[in-house]
Amino acid sequence: MIEADRLIAADAQSEEEFLDRAIRPKTLADYVGQPQVRGQMEIFIKAAKLRGDALDHLLIFGPPGLGKTTLANIVANEMGVNLRTTSGPVLEKAGDLAAMLTNLEPHDVLFIDEIHRLSPVVEEVLYPAMEDYQLDIMIGEGPAARSIKIDLPPFTLVGATTRAGSLTSPLRDRFGIVQRLEFYQVADLQHIVGRSAHCLGLALTDEGALEVARRSRGTPRIANRLLRRVRDFAEVCADGRIDGEVAAQALNMLDVDAAGFDYMDRKLLLAVIDKFMGGPVGLDNLAAAIGEERETIEDVLEPYLIQQGFIQRTPRGRIATVHAYQHFGIDRAE
């Protein structure tokens, strides 16, 4: 099993980019949640515009699905400049990056998603571009090779990553602004679901929005995906109107429970509780018990369960916490 196969996967699915673009907020005024990030960016953007400068280079990091691309779009819109978008794996050669940099207009925003996946060769080209707005390019080969410098217009690099720790220190140190996105509160997700429903022309009550928000694992991308699936259910089974009861019925049918867990989450938790008496259990034994690869457990299933306090990793193995027992209504044997 891979993460993209799950309805509650935080990573973007191929068909979602166009749909998400239609409901994506365009300004900081429409940006819900992340109050500290929003407040800081409002000040930084206003200050840059007052000075007539490009915004300082911005690094955005955090779990997938929290709105890093959305924030990059908002920065460009608020600055009134163009947004050029690419990703680390796409920039294979130094020339790929040079082509993008030389086509920028003054103060434009260059957005590099998955910036931690830049190759060392491309990263070396980026250093003088970020620091001095200059591009160092080698022309020719062998003894005839020579370096030329090309002046670039002032621009803003916005880098996004889910793995800030994988960035090299020289690259990380060149970002003047660093923002971490946190998982969203249910109230903020309810607001986001309501706004998305309005953009999509859906009849959604506050209770319906709350039900979707509670099961969205703190992630707007998941909330919007669940909303679209609930819409399908409502159009067929409830005359298109989504209240709390309809949303709950739809999400139960989709096997997403009140905590946002799907079948695989529950299977893992129940294996620890029932088959290994709550743990500790080694990763290989747990993988064999649920019929999954150990990498799937470590990379796909465990992170959210650990973050929510349902599973603990210890030197002796995995342990189910009291929250896991309470979720299933099971008494914990002392």
Curated annotation (Swiss-Prot):
Query: Region (Small ATPAse domain (RuvB-S)): which ranges?
Result: 185-255
Which reaction is the catalytic activity of this chain?
ATP + H2O = ADP + phosphate + H(+)
**What segment(s) does the record annotate as region Large ATPase domain (RuvB-L)?**
4-184
One of the GO biological process terms: DNA repair
> Which family would the database say this protein is a member of?
Belongs to the RuvB family.
Q: What class of enzyme is it?
A: hydrolase
Q: Provide the GO MF annotations for this entry.
A: ATP binding; ATP hydrolysis activity; four-way junction DNA binding; four-way junction helicase activity
**What domain notes does the record hold?**
Has 3 domains, the large (RuvB-L) and small ATPase (RuvB-S) domains and the C-terminal head (RuvB-H) domain. The head domain binds DNA, while the ATPase domains jointly bind ATP, ADP or are empty depending on the state of the subunit in the translocation cycle. During a single DNA translocation step the structure of each domain remains the same, but their relative positions change.
Q: Which organism is it from?
A: Edwardsiella ictaluri (strain 93-146)
Keywords on record:
ATP-binding, Cytoplasm, DNA damage, DNA recombination, DNA repair, DNA-binding, Hydrolase, Nucleotide-binding
- Provide the residue span(s) of the region labelled Head domain (RuvB-H): 258-334
Q: Where in the cell is it found?
A: Cytoplasm
One GO term describing the cellular component = Holliday junction resolvase complex
Q: What does this protein do?
A: The RuvA-RuvB-RuvC complex processes Holliday junction (HJ) DNA during genetic recombination and DNA repair, while the RuvA-RuvB complex plays an important role in the rescue of blocked DNA replication forks via replication fork reversal (RFR). RuvA specifically binds to HJ cruciform DNA, conferring on it an open structure. The RuvB hexamer acts as an ATP-dependent pump, pulling dsDNA into and through the RuvAB complex. RuvB forms 2 homohexamers on either side of HJ DNA bound by 1 or 2 RuvA tetramers; 4 subunits per hexamer contact DNA at a time.
- Record-linked InterPro entries: AAA+_ATPase (IPR003593), AAA_lid_4 (IPR041445), DNA_helicase_Holl-junc_RuvB (IPR004605), P-loop_NTPase (IPR027417), RuvB-like_N (IPR008824), RuvB_C (IPR008823), WH-like_DNA-bd_sf (IPR036388), WH_DNA-bd_sf (IPR036390)
Complex and partners? Homohexamer. Forms an RuvA(8)-RuvB(12)-Holliday junction (HJ) complex. HJ DNA is sandwiched between 2 RuvA tetramers; dsDNA enters through RuvA and exits via RuvB. An RuvB hexamer assembles on each DNA strand where it exits the tetramer. Each RuvB hexamer is contacted by two RuvA subunits (via domain III) on 2 adjacent RuvB subunits; this complex drives branch migration. In the full resolvosome a probable DNA-RuvA(4)-RuvB(12)-RuvC(2) complex forms which resolves the HJ.
Q: Which residues bind DNA?
A: R294, R313, R318
Classify the main location. cytoplasm
Binding of Mg(2+), residues: T69
Q: Which gene encodes it?
A: ruvB
Q: What is its EC number?
A: 3.6.4.-
Q: What is this protein called?
A: Holliday junction branch migration complex subunit RuvB
- Where does this protein hold ATP? I23, R24, G65, K68, T69, T70, E131, D132, Y133, R174, Y184, R221
